[in-house]
Amino acid sequence: TNQTRDYMMNRYGEHGFDIDLYEGYETFPKKYWPLKNDLHSDQWSAIRYMISGYDENISRPSHLYKNAISYSRNAYGKPSLMLNELRYVLGDSLFYSSIQHLYKKWKLKHIDEDKIIDAIEEHVGEELDWFFDPWLHTTRHLDYEISSFKKVKNNNAWDIELVIKNKGLRFMPLLVETEYEDGSIDRQWWDRHLWRFEDTLKYSSKKKPKAITLDPDVQLMDLDYRNNSTKMDRRFIFDWPGLNYKPRHAVVYRWMPTFYYNYKTSDFSPGLKINKSYGHYENTNFHFYPSLNPKKIYWHMNGWRQAVHYFPRTKFYFWGFNKPGVEEYGVEIEKKWNRVYGRTSTHTFSGGLYFQPKYDSLRAINLGYNPNGRLAVGYLDWNSSIGAVDLNLNAASTMGDYSTWNFHRLTALSTFKSKKIYGVRTFQRVIAGKIWSENQIPGQEHYNIEGNSANDLLRKNYLVDQFYGSFDLFN
């Protein structure tokens, strides 16, 4: 796996494949898409597995892995990235010559872990247990960060002090790149890495430093590169539909212009949608669109965050919007669970709350809302699937004095998607539920075609309306 990736990237570039062999890459819009980095893609795939809570040791016998996906990750993906890190430590020349030495010594014979390590150490001339043991016999993670950076003018030179902190449990030497104000760069190795969770690197330069980066070539399996540089790279690209672009060393900003028009309320509303994302850890959408009549700025923001070292497969969601008709703010915690990693039913547990402090009666009434009050709802939710059937159970309740209305609701939702027969696929949805209340339920919390409440519909930018204009079909 490592050899194939190295060859393909060396021959065809960082994307790692021959564009001429793939249909569509010379046509719009893929012609203008940024190409992915093949190494980065493999690293992200391994990181998703490593932070899932289901990671297993590479050295485990194949028949003891919990399932085929774990076997695949530990037989191919992780070992290939381990060898990539070994090349980073030894350098290209010594790494490739050590692999050649291994082949010549044991060619056409069955070998084990000890013979591989002994042959490489024999050729390199140093012990590498500190490198191989954590990779092969543990699931320790690597995550270095620059915790502080100081630069002080000292006569005709600059004194630089860099504090490096290890947030993981695996240790590696680091290539440290210093970028200067004149655009030039300088690189040096920090090798005081063994069993150090924090260290200070001090050096001087005649040039004024601008930024510092750890592992600038992104060769290590460092879980989070946002803390590897004093100046994180940013990429601004048009938000092409279907684009999947996740560089390891850069935060990606996608942008797209939007246009809304509603002759009754907001008139013509040109706007801009911006998305900020970084790998498996963060995603934020911000959308604003000023209305010409009335002159008002409407907006919508939502996103999620995921911790690097804690709470595996747990996302923290947030959202807020001020749209024609209603204003809302909400938060949610979501936890996913599988019996093993992948290929089994995923159980998604979540809990959250949302608050609607005010309404615009002109638009809210048209949506079926009751604008005479405010609404605060807390909820718990479970979702899973059995084959082609999705199941959902939701329990919701208003939050005391924060809500004008008082009710409790329990809802079961089932959806089914059939296979295509003669090019036709059918979708079915069943909603069953009950609402308990001593007074009238506001229209925004009634059952409708979207599910639990009209809020499910409102949170979709392209459906801020009745169900195709039909009130009877909507409710």
Named regions from a protein language model:
Residues 1-163, 171, 181-184, 212:
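Hydrophobic alpha-helical and helix-loop surface patches within well-folded domains
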Residues 92, 127, 250-252, 281-283, ...:
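Strand-connecting loop/turn motifs
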Residues 100-107, 117-120, 288-292, 319-321, ...:
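Conserved short loop/turn motifs at secondary-structure junctions
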Residues 147-153, 257-261, 353:
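Short amphipathic beta-strand and strand-loop transition segments with alternating hydrophobic
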Residues 172, 182, 200-204, 215-318, ...:
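Outer-membrane beta-barrel initiation region
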Residues 173-201:
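Solvent-exposed beta-strand/loop surfaces of large extracellular or lumenal domains
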Residues 206-210:
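Noncatalytic modules at the cell exterior or secretory-pathway interfaces
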Residues 315-320, 330-334, 346-352, 359-475:
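C-terminal outer-membrane beta-barrel translocator/porin domains of Gram-negative envelope proteins
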